[in-house]
Amino acid sequence: VKTVISVTTDRQPGGIATALTGYSRALNIAGYQHMVILPEGASALAALANEPNTEIKSFPLGWLKFHILTRFIFCPSIRARLSDARAILVHNARLVTSLSRFTPPHFLVNHSGKLRNLGKADNILFLSSAAQNRAKRAFEALGMAAAEQPKCTILPHGFLLPATARKKAAKQDKDKIPKIIAAGRFVEKKGFADLIDAAALLQHQNIPCTIELYGAGPLEDSYQRQIDQLGVQNITLKGWAENLSSCFAKADIFCLPSHEEPFGLILGEAMLAGLPVIASMTDGPCDILGAGGTSPEATLSCGGLLYPQGAPEALAEALCLLIKDEESCAAAALAGSKHIAEHYSLEKQAQALDAILTTAKR
């Protein structure tokens, strides 16, 4: 059995944890075994334990860092597996130097879209075209000739498609107030302060809506103070939701107001759930919604609207458009689920990943 090994020191919930499960599923579809080396207590462990053809090796974080630094010389069984693997997927840029000394081709998975340590990798997998373009400009600015640059490939995440397409039931009550939801960690880069400001603008304009913000994090108290100081009554902090699918089922619109969004897994999940979406013009959303251009007509045909990041007024305008235009809202919902199914399925990711691994040179 062909084995691909993923290595990470990340323990937090979020992008890397979710991506590891996605890679396990894609590799399984493509006929590979996936071995994941990660810290004890990592958020990804529970989900990975249920994936077929996935083998888990966990260590206390300090020991894992030591083993990576010493290239597992004191753990000969894993050292042998790393030497014989079809490929090594490195999920933290700072680990590239140590892991690149093994024989198999290594791929840095650029989850963050940032540029740190990219030049040390032989191969880089980017989640978006914007991230890839930034990296190539950075390599050129450093004077790296094309032959010296890492091989850069765009490999977006894939989504497990439902057995049948999900369609939101049409609103039976024409007077029902539209419900907008957003979710994520309460940190500055997620842009939820902009959503609160946009909620205040909608309230001032007497645009009927309720906004539910799911999440937790260091800025929770700050967001509540902002809501109180603005006197906003149409937005509520709901805490962390373990099962967002039930939240999607009760919502009418999904909003992703991030200042940084390397891909936006939650955006695709909302679209598959049958929600029209509004997202900031960040890396992932621009690829997902902007495939045919960034005009409202073009993005609505892919599932929603884009607006300039960090612009609450533009966000409020986009929300207002979907709230008032139920026909466009419904059409965007149908277009979005179709767009994800056609272009971002797990099968598409598996095919692309298999092609990358098959042509990679040892």
Placement of each model-derived feature along the sequence:
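Aromatic "clamp/platform" in nucleotide-sugar-dependent glycosyltransferases that forms part
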Residues: 240, 259
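A short, active-site helix/loop in glycosyltransferases that binds the activated sugar's phosphate group
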Residues: 122-154, 159-163
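Conserved acidic donor-binding segment of nucleotide-sugar-dependent glycosyltransferases
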Residues: 290-312, 322-326
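Short His-centered aromatic/hydrophobic patch
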Residues: 70-71, 89-95, 110
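A conserved mid-protein helix/loop that constitutes part of the nucleotide-sugar donor-binding site
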Residues: 14-22, 178-201, 218-224, 313
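N-terminal strand-loop element at the rim of the active site
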Residues: 6-14, 18-68, 145-148
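Short hydrophobic beta-strand element within catalytic cores of glycosyltransferases
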Residues: 276-279, 286-290
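Nucleotide-activated donor-binding/catalytic signature segment of Leloir-type glycosyltransferases, i.e.
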Residues: 224-239
